[in-house]
């Protein structure tokens, strides 16, 4: 096999090792996640109280295990984030948690095919001084028939995760050499069902660019 021109970190995270959290373990994770939610800066926005937490498959990267979470609030916002920890001889320790909120939810976006959340957890240094954002991605498919989800960078698969209770978690490099992650949903027979970018283009920005181009053309 000849050398590749896409020298980038791939499949660096361990696949999920556990079932989705439940019982006392879920209670422990919930405590850390809710504490992170309390620390969110809302700029005086009333986001409400968190409801039931949906946990996502665990993934382990560079010695830390990440368990993402999502919860809807009483005001219709969505809390999203993760709890991470190290595995010591006595069990999980060194817990950390992050959380944020959004008003952009799947219920209000019928054109979405995948409901995605993401957070950068590390940096990978590549060739010629370039670096990639090691990104935790989690979500749910909004179309039926899926079995596995992949993360692709410039059409190169860099991670994958089988659906677990219709949920998935990925850890993959993003924003490397002007290439950006695309998340794809695949069926059991290997057929592509859906694809979504982590980046949503703003229609207003597109209109502004088009307007500027029109002005330049007139000049």
Sequence positions of predicted segments:
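Short amphipathic beta-strand and strand-loop transition segments with alternating hydrophobic
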Residues: 48-60, 123-128
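Ser/Thr-rich low-complexity repeats and stalk/linker segments
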Residues: 130-136, 140-205
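Generic recognition of long tandem-repeat/solenoid scaffolds
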Residues: 67-69, 94-99, 137, 170, ...
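A general sequence property marking short-to-moderate contiguous segments
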Residues: 30-37, 41-43, 62-127
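N-terminal low-complexity, intrinsically disordered tails enriched in Ser/Pro/Gly
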Residues: 1-52
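Extracellular beta-sheet/turn segments enriched in Thr/Pro/Gly and aliphatic residues
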Residues: 200-219
């Amino acid at each position: 096999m000849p050398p590749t021109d896409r020298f980038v970190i791939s499949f660096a995270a361990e696949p999920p090792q556990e079932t989705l959290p439940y019982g006392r373990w879920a209670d422990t994770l919930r405590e850390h996640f809710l504490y992170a939610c309390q620390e969110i800066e809302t700029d005086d926005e009333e986001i409400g109280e968190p409801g039931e937490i949906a946990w996502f498959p665990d993934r382990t990267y560079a010695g830390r295990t990440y368990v993402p979470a999502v919860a809807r609030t009483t005001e219709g916002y969505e809390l999203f984030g993760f709890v991470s920890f190290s595995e010591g001889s006595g069990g999980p320790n060194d817990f950390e948690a992050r959380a944020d909120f959004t008003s952009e939810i799947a219920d209000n976006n019928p054109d979405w095919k995948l409901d995605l959340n993401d957070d950068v957890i590390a940096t990978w240094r590549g060739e010629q001084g370039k670096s990639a954002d090691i990104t935790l991605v989690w979500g749910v498919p909004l179309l039926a028939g899926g079995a596995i989800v992949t993360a692709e960078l410039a059409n190169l698969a860099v991670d994958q995760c089988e659906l677990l209770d219709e949920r998935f978690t990925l850890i993959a490099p993003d924003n490397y050499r002007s290439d950006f992650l695309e998340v794809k949903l695949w069926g059991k027979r290997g057929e592509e069902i859906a694809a979504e970018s982590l980046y949503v283009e703003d229609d207003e920005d597109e209109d502004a660019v088009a307007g500027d181009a029109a002005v330049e053309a007139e000049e």
